[in-house]
């Protein structure tokens, strides 16, 4: 059977596990770089099966639902507007249209959960941009901090999205090895990579 981007694993279980650990560690602040892009037609607490946007994790809504201080940023006005609509009523949620790296350079709260999901894998410098975001954010990560990175199961081969050829691909290709060298541990690996300082 030939591989298709549509046959990929959904990020749901990784997002749920990151939230579970965040709550067990009494986390206070979540930062998401790259917010929700599509609507969904299923209850948010259920893993999507037949939802057309099944491969999107709807992370923005999951994180807003925790009640923690939640900051989500994106450069797309359309994505920001959708995120604001879908998280309306969540008191501790701040959605902002700004470049993720610029945001992180001006963010000074301790981060308990960082989600890196901004520059699409198809963008030539996606891995480098996510590494830059990590480098800026790491000094703000709390001692019990978690980092979740989406789209680590794919890469670009001959100009097309394909399964990752390295252990960590896509958005985590550069971040994960650097973070591991700095003491971060991989808790989960697949569609997403979940890293922990503990």
Feature roles, as predicted:
Residues 2-14:
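Conserved SAM-binding loop and adjacent beta-strand
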Residues 6-9, 48-51, 93-95, 122-126, ...:
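Short, flexible loop segments at the rims of nucleotide/cofactor-binding pockets, characterized by
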Residues 16-104:
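SAM cofactor-binding core of SAM-dependent methyltransferases
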Residues 31-33, 73, 114-118, 147-151:
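Active-site flanking residues adjacent to catalytic metal/cofactor-binding acidic residues
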Residues 37-40, 120-123, 153-155:
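Short acidic, S/G/P-rich loop/turn micro-motifs used as interaction or catalytic elements
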Residues 106-113:
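A short acidic, Gly/Pro-enriched loop at the edge of an enzyme's catalytic core
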Residues 113-127:
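A short SAM/SAH-binding and catalytic strip from SAM-dependent methyltransferases
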Residues 124-198:
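C-terminal substrate-binding/active-site "lid" region of AdoMet-derived donor-dependent transferases
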């Amino acid at each position: 059977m030939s591989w298709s981007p549509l046959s990929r694993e959904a990020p749901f279980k990784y997002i749920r596990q990151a939230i579970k650990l965040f709550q067990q560690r009494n986390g206070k602040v979540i930062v998401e770089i790259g917010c929700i892009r599509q609507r969904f037609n299923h209850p948010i607490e259920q893993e999507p099966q037949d939802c057309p946007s099944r491969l999107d994790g709807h992370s923005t809504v999951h994180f807003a639902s925790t009640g923690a201080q939640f900051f989500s940023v994106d450069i797309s006005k359309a994505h920001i507007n959708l995120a604001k609509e879908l998280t309306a009523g969540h008191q501790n949620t701040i959605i902002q249209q700004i470049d993720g790296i610029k945001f992180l350079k001006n963010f000074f709260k301790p981060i308990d959960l960082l989600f890196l999901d901004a520059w699409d894998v198809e963008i030539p410098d996606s891995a480098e941009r996510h590494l830059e975001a990590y480098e800026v954010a790491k000094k703000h990560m709390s001692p019990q901090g978690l980092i979740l990175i989406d789209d680590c199961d794919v890469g670009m081969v001959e100009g097309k999205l394909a399964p990752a050829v390295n252990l960590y691909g896509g958005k985590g290709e550069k971040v994960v090895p650097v973070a591991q060298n700095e003491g971060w541990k991989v808790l989960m690996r697949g569609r997403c990579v979940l890293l922990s300082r503990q």
